[in-house]
Structures are given as C-alpha cells and as structure tokens.
Amino acid sequence: MSIVKTGGRVAIVLPDNVLTDGGATAKVREKLLKDFNLHTILRLPTGIFYAGGVKTNVLFFEKGKPTEDIWVYDYRTGVKHTMATKPMTRENLNEFVECYCTGHTQDRKETYSTENPNGRWRKFSKEEIDEAYEKNTGVLIA
C-alpha cells in the first residue's frame, strides 16, 4: 500500500479474513479505510482463486481520501463455480460491470432493497461500516 501514489487506483484479490480478523489484519484494514477510499468490494464465489472453501473478494480502492461509503456486489450468494467444471467467465460479471459505472460512480444505484432482497449491489455508509466492525458482525461480507 505504501507504493501507491496519491490518486493511484488498486484492485486486489484477498481472502475474507482480511476484512474481519483482528491483529495485523485489523491494522491493515484500519489503514485502508483511513488512507484510502475503499469504494467497492466484489464478493466472489468460494474456491475461485484458492483451495475449496476459501472465500475471496476483490477490493477496489484509491489512495488519497478516507473511505466514506463502500459499494458491495455480492456475486457469492446462490452462485457456484469451480475451476475445473464450471469456471467463472467475463460474462458472469456483466451485471457487476454495469453496476460499477466506471468513471461515473455518482450514477451508481443499489439493486438490493427490502423489496428486492435478491439484489446483489448494495451501498454501506461509513457509520454502518464502523458499527459492523465494533459489533464484529461482518456485515460487509457475511
């Protein structure tokens, strides 16, 4: 994270525990939320990059200002891919790419709501993020 210049953009694949565990990962998470704008998390199905059972996310962030809102796209719930028999393809992420609105983040619209609980695209405020970590609920990746 230290080599990223102000305004630099990063996308990185990390296991869930980086977003939830204490100790060293908690310090990394705190620095990420304070020194970077972690604006998007793409939750991937289990076993896409690592051994079976390992849950992963793609984190998208920019260096410069602290995190205010995090948009989460849940591509994990109800989806199963395997590297051997049913690999994930670019087409599987078309809805995410559409929701992401590259260059037009102000145009993002949630697809998740109480009326549409199957929607995959949801925004969490800084207050919701802080509360989730204080209560250790894992709301962003549960």
What are these regions (language model features)?
Residues 1-142:
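A conserved structural/catalytic subdomain of Rossmann-like adenosyl-cofactor enzymes
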